[in-house]
């Protein structure tokens, strides 16, 4: 059994004295583990950096075996954003959330393409807004997507101001009424119209709610990866510095 594909390196852990087990995310194979012989060596360390894009060949005697990888570096991303702490935190968050969320060996070609785009845009203008859109796409792929097309209560499409924390559907200001304080605010950033970083943080609070209270329980109630909170903290510090 074998296949070859470009993949995004999500995680690396030591295996024995000299090898490593890596987790790759590819378009057609999904999240797929494999052993890299000699992966713990100094020679391989620059290749096996989380977020790197690798040309990988996987081989195993049987399809249900963990198998082994041979890899070549296509694009190393961590070194490119090493001087940008916020972008580096974004890289870590993307990889950690994918490893946390995706089942093994299930293909998500659309999410793979979107992930490549958001990683390639790290540090660019409006990348944080693109990251928010990526989290929304992840929720959709996992079956917990937001529906911001119309009010869940009345069907109107104007003056949508809130989101139901239970269903992820939009609610108009008029329909919310006295229940408004129990709903999540609909940040313009969730519709691609962020006015500034505060809107993006408000949007991430919404996606964070659904990641923590809907997705995580479906995966055995595991806590969200700490890397995501480190990104939120980094973005908040950036806002504070910008306003000082």
Curated annotation (Swiss-Prot):
Protein biosynthesis is among the record's keywords: no
Gene3D superfamilies: Nucleic acid-binding proteins, Recombination protein O, C-terminal domain
Keywords of this entry: DNA damage, DNA recombination, DNA repair
GO cellular component: bacterial nucleoid
Top-rank taxon: Bacteria
GO terms of biological process kind: DNA recombination; double-strand break repair
NCBIfam families: reco
PANTHER family per UniProt: DNA REPAIR PROTEIN RECO (PTHR33991:SF1)
Family assignment from sequence similarity: Belongs to the RecO family.
HAMAP family found in the cross-reference section: RecO
UniProt-recorded name of the protein: DNA repair protein RecO
